[in-house]
Amino acid sequence: MKKQLKVIIYVDILFAVLLLFFWFSLPKPLFITPTSYVLEASNGELLSASIAKDGQWRFPLADSVPEKFKHCIITFEDKRFYNHLGVDFIAVVRAIRQNMQAKSVASGASTLSMQVIRLSRKKQRTIFQKLAEMWMAVRFEVSYSKEEILTLYAANAPFGSNVVGLEAASWRYYGRPAENLSWGEMATLAVLPNSPSLVRPGKNASRLIIKRNNLLDKLVEEKIIDRATAQLSKAEPIPSAPLPLPQNAPHLLNRFKDEMKALKVNTTRITSTIDENLQKELNRLTAQYHQKFAANGINNLAALVINIKNGSVVAYVGNCYLPQQKEMESHVDMISARRSPGSTLKPLLYASMLNDGFILPQTLISDVPTQIGGYSPQNFDLGYDGAIPADRALSRSLNIPAVKMLQQYKYERFYDKLKKFNFSTLNKPADHYGLSLILGGSEVTMWDLSNAYLGMARTLNHYNDYQGKYNNADYGSAYYVKDQEKPEEVIEPTSLLDHGTIWSTFNAMEEVMRPGDEGLWQQFSSSQRIAWKTGTSFGFRDAWSVGLTPNYVVCVWVGNADGEGRPGLTGIEAAAPFMFDVFRLLPSSKWFEMPKTKLKRIAVCKQSGYKASPICETKLVQWVPPVGEKTALCPYHKLIHLDAAETYQVTNQCYSVTQMKHKSWFVLPPTMEYYYKTKNAEYRILPLFMEGCQQEQTAVMEMIYPKANASIYIPLEIDGNRGKAVFNVAHRNNNATIHWHIDEEYVGTTKNFHQIALSPKPGKHTLTLTDQNGERLVQVFTVLDKEK
């Protein structure tokens, strides 16, 4: 009895060991081979793919297998597939009998389950390996459904050359997805894994046709297809050689490779948010412009289109893709490249100053020759307006007003604001950039720049959705993975910029004259309203244009990836036409809704754009952000006293108060006035004081160059002698005579036009100017010595 009990225990132990061995004999995961990176459009169509790390075209596991392939592969390889548990013993007995009769391997008995095991193990086949495959195939069938087994087979079967898996084979041999293949095409693919090294497209074509036709006949016998379908399928040609896979978004595919971990995606295949038709049209447009630009040595351009409504990327062209021309550097993704932004940050400064109560939309900004700590910004046209409304300075992209505005706003504050806009490339302290920050002194990426404008547009679009409040998630990054998890809504009473500020900024950005339209585009009812801004970096290295409607943000860049500058490479000439052609590919939309509860009607001085003071002559009522109430009153209107004929200024010391006429007068500082009056014919210069009247202490002269306490350098001429610097002063009286002195030494006299060429020695000097009325201007400047 005890002996029998021991036997039972030993048998149970043996059975348990065998059961454990059986259970753990199947490796997990079954396949650890690398797969190709695959990028699909939002409709599931293939956009781009790259070869796997082991040099094979092997797509990730698909969700299902096309019905045609199921019928073909089961009929050809394993007709009792649905009736066995991994091993087809009927086929085994048949194979043994046939092989014994032929005295060689004339027939096999591998089921599809066994073939999947063999593909996963990749070991040399022996009788023992065959038995192991049978064992593991049974174990395989225990854990996997028949559909899962077919899916694994279809994804890992060899199809000749370096093509692995049905999806890769379908694209390589037929240029389209497997579900779109005909019976003849699917039968051709189904027979390839049987002997992929001997029979494949481009090799042994006649044998491949025979095998395909035999399979089609079997499908007729099994009543899967009819005879007519089989005959038509036999007439189809077989592919002659592998085809290149689509490369409609190669740069986005590479971006996905780099960001795969951050995106928390566990497969190398993603369905993107890209609109397939728009992407192809944008590729065509990019190639068209590349052909045009290449004649001028401009090799690279990129375009990004984002759907504002949901924040999804609908088109992504990182460069004009020309892999066969390596000198073009078309592999560089310019959407993620760090480049100088030129003037494209100016709207963000304009919006920040509106939002924080520094200016109103049309506040006059100084536009005169400027020196700030040795830094001398220049307008692109090298001219000066004297003073210009802030919104017009933005639309004309003037550099000096932008620097003046940043000087007022403080570059440290603007730097912090850009950080909140999520510009990832500002990795140095604010002092490193200084005032050049507004003129392209930093680096940005197209991605970050587009996301900044996307956040503003989304915020304004959501004005009604959140009852005037703000969702901080609006400033989150755009996304390109279709099912990517969206950030949670965080509703706050305030945001980076308020609705009224954004609306005012977009209106200012809309007023730019479009290239080729000569300012008349607004007269056409079909014209799309677009807020847009161009940018050109120093040395003509980068041309930018970014634009938006309530539905889309479009950002384009034109230039050379290696940073070489080219004549004519400007935002308005190169990038803007490209951007507007991109907008023509997109549906039109209405303009942004006016956020009336976030705007306030206040009286504004027509001439200065400041909040109107009581003595402003002409007032306008404008919609401005409520914080505009905090801005300063107009500083340029002054109450002056005139004689009865309104010819001269007078004082009570020389003229009867009862006969005086008191008038409000628009008066700019001398330097601003000097340039402003040449561009504005309606500007009236202050009348002179009547003879014998004591003048009030108002500035009548102002130095244009050099500014007070400026350090200047006077270069040496070719002959080795020191050259001359042109000193320039503005005087309110056009007929004034000015006497010039340097260090109390007389150097010359000017009348009407007050410029003089001087060559002071290196060192510190005192400049003294005196006009015919005894008015004096004294200031200090320093001439630098190059040798020191």
Task: Give names to the regions the model predicted.
Residues 1-5, 485-491, 529-788:
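Soluble, non-transmembrane domains of envelope/secretory-pathway proteins that act on or interact
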Residues 2-295, 312-314, 368, 404:
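Juxtamembrane regions of bacterial inner-membrane/periplasmic proteins
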Residues 38, 45-59, 168, 197-201, ...:
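Short pre-catalytic segments that frame enzyme active sites
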Residues 44, 73, 116, 149, ...:
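Residue-level preference for non-acidic, small/hydrophobic
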Residues 88-94, 136, 167, 206-208, ...:
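Acidic/histidine-enriched alpha-helical segments
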Residues 101-125, 179, 242-258, 359-414, ...:
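Conserved catalytic neighborhood of penicillin-recognizing serine enzymes
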Residues 115-122, 155-162, 179, 183-195, ...:
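Glycine-rich, acidic and aromatic/proline-enriched surface loops and short helix-turn segments
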Residues 272-293, 305-307, 316, 324-337, ...:
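A penicillin-recognizing enzyme superfamily signal
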